[in-house]
A protein has these predicted regions:
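Short, flexible, mixed-charge acidic loops at enzyme active sites
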Residues: 1, 132-133
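Flexible gly/pro-rich beta->alpha loop and the following alpha-helix that scaffold active-site loops
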Residues: 1-35
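Pocket-forming structural segment of enzyme catalytic cores
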Residues: 48-129
Length: 133
């Protein structure tokens, strides 16, 4: 599930968000891998019980995140990695979720819970402004 300009709980304006949350819960319940980036991270986290709120300030631009738990997905990273941020809302960690990374202003930058992986940041964009890879 990728990003978008809406809020993860804007069900009245974007009814498809509710269906995405339902699909996220079903994927985790059945052990199917699911990845969320930015808004997708927030949809998965809230679908799994995390709280959504406005951040203290928008987090926009390239800035570092810190890996807090060495996980298979992130084992190739240094302890700190500079990534693109583009969000106003933040989520808490779902119950039983494993915190993987944080930034100075966003406590939950990445988490894992069962088959779900959520990343608030945009790893698909590099500092040169093009798609990574």
């Amino acid at each position: 599930i990728m990003g978008g300009p809406m809020g993860a709980l804007d069900y009245d304006k974007y009814p498809g968000l509710k269906a995405e949350a339902k699909l996220a819960r079903a994927a985790v319940a059945s052990g199917k891998p699911i990845l969320g980036v930015c808004l997708g991270h927030q949809i998965i986290a809230t679908a799994l019980g995390a709280q959504l709120r406005k951040g203290d300030a928008p987090e926009i631009g390239f800035a570092p995140i810190k890996r807090v738990d060495k996980h298979d997905f992130f084992s190739m990273w240094d302890k700190q990695l500079t990534v693109l941020h583009w969000h106003n809302d933040v989520v808490g960690l779902p119950a039983e979720g494993q915190l993987l990374s944080r930034s100075s202003s966003t406590k939950v930058q990445a988490f894992r819970l069962g088959s779900a992986l959520g990343m608030q940041f945009h790893l698909e964009v590099c500092a040169a402004g093009r798609m990574a890879g």
